[in-house]
A protein has these predicted regions:
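Short, Lys/Arg-enriched N-terminal segments with co-localized hydrophobic residues
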Residues: 1-15
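Flexible, solvent-exposed loop/hinge segments and secondary-structure transition points
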Residues: 17-208
Length: 208
């Protein structure tokens, strides 16, 4: 018997066969290269959407907490018995001053900031009476180096400025020396106090 030779594939059949042979390889490449990218993009989109929802949900809470903390700081330097209902917001534009309030009897508190160590802000709440005397201070130096710059937030440091007249600015050494090893933080507190004094003199004292 004569052995039949294999039938030669026509051109169209040959191309189809080659394409069929390549299909598994292309599918494998897609799974190995493209599919992970698609999955990663989908995950990123889902995470972004969840973060947006979370931010929308927490933003009002954060804002409320910030307002509560600021209110507590204002009240902490005012006479005992002062309440939130006694405070009136003051619109201020003095550089580095972030807020101010006054009371019906003429007391005022100015919130100011200054860059301390590594550029981190120190926040000061300075209370003034009707004569312009600095009656109380509160200093948030929690952003400064613990045990060094953070000491500027202790009353043993800033308490020396209580009783100072707003008729002149304060400076290191007059009446309080800088804390050893924390000159930058000490200067930040002084700068913030002086900003508060400027605000009081220019935007609160004598203004109805």
């Amino acid at each position: 018997w004569a052995t039949k030779s294999p039938r030669k594939l026509r051109k169209g059949e040959r191309i189809m066969a080659e394409n069929n042979a390549k299909a598994p390889e292309q599918e494998s490449n897609f799974k190995a290269l493209v599919l992970p990218v698609i999955v990663l993009v989908v995950i990123c989109l889902v995470c972004s959407a969840l973060l947006a929802v979370l931010n929308d949900a927490t933003a009002p809470i954060i804002e409320a907490n910030t307002k509560a903390e600021t209110l507590a700081a204002y009240l902490s330097v005012l006479p005992e018995g002062t309440t939130a209902d006694d405070l009136q917001d003051v619109t201020v534009t003095t550089a580095n001053v972030t807020g101010a309030v006054k009371t019906a009897d003429g007391m005022a508190v100015v919130q100011s900031t200054a860059a301390g160590y590594s550029g981190n802000l120190v926040t000061v709440y300075a209370a003034f009476d009707t004569t312009g005397t600095l009656t109380a201070l509160s200093v948030d130096a929690s952003t400064q180096t613990t045990g060094i710059g953070s000491k500027t937030g202790e009353e043993s440091f800033y308490g020396g400025y209580v009783g100072w007249s707003a008729s002149q600015q304060v400076e290191l050494g007059n009446p309080v020396d800088a804390i050893g090893g924390a000159t930058i933080s000490s200067r930040a507190v002084v700068s913030a106090i002086n900003s508060a004094i400027d605000c009081y003199n220019n935007e609160i004292a004598g203004v109805a």
